[in-house]
Amino acid sequence: MEWLEVAKIANTHGLKGELKLLASTDFPEQRFKVGNEVFLESNGIYTPFMISSYRKHKQFIMVTFKGMQHINDVEKYKGLKLYVHPEALQELGEHEFYYHEIIGCTVFDGEDEIGVVSEILETGANDVWTIKRPGKKDVLIPYIEQVVASIDVEAKRIQITPLPGLIEG
């Protein structure tokens, strides 16, 4: 089974077992909802944990796990990653995609390859994709209708029509 990474444990917070997560998932408020199950991976072993609290704090997601009420219970998890089963994903509407479907796609302008989507930034109005280009500076592409012409997640191919000045160098 292919597990889906949803966060990295950046640190602990306070003394009551709260964890500071760097989320790598879309819809964190649904993914880390109280009562949901996530899996912590360590040495190839996936251990289930139930979310007992969730809140946002700056750019971090703060959670506690059921039964883990002290910093000593969770400190050993710093730096580890959290995963979910692929079955935990909800159906999305048309023109909606999960991050893991977009990250790793190759971006083209016509037949010219621009690079590969390496990261998705949430900006509020629309997402912005970071495109890694071999030997060149990264390019930031807004996920808007005027720029993104088509997405084929099966072929891992994205076709864009860049605005003037969007891609330089």
Curated annotation (Swiss-Prot):
Ranges where the PRC barrel domain occurs: 93-166
Compartment(s) where it occurs, according to its Swiss-Prot or TrEMBL record: Cytoplasm
The keyword NAD is annotated on this UniProt entry: no
GO CC terms, sorted: cytoplasm; ribosome
Keywords (A to Z) from UniProt: Chaperone, Cytoplasm, Ribosome biogenesis, rRNA processing
Gene Ontology process terms (BP): ribosomal small subunit biogenesis; rRNA processing
Keyword RNA-binding: no
GO molecular function: ribosome binding
InterPro entries: PRC-brl_dom, PRC_barrel-like_sf, RimM, RimM_N, RimM_N_sf, Transl_B-barrel_sf
Annotated family: Belongs to the RimM family.
Subunit details: Binds ribosomal protein uS19.
This protein's domain notes: The PRC barrel domain binds ribosomal protein uS19.
PANTHER family: RIBOSOME MATURATION FACTOR RIMM
Protein's job: An accessory protein needed during the final step in the assembly of 30S ribosomal subunit, possibly for assembly of the head region. Essential for efficient processing of 16S rRNA. May be needed both before and after RbfA during the maturation of 16S rRNA. It has affinity for free ribosomal 30S subunits but not for 70S ribosomes.
Protein known as: Ribosome maturation factor RimM
Organism this protein belongs to: Exiguobacterium sibiricum (strain DSM 17290 / CCUG 55495 / CIP 109462 / JCM 13490 / 255-15)
Gene: rimM
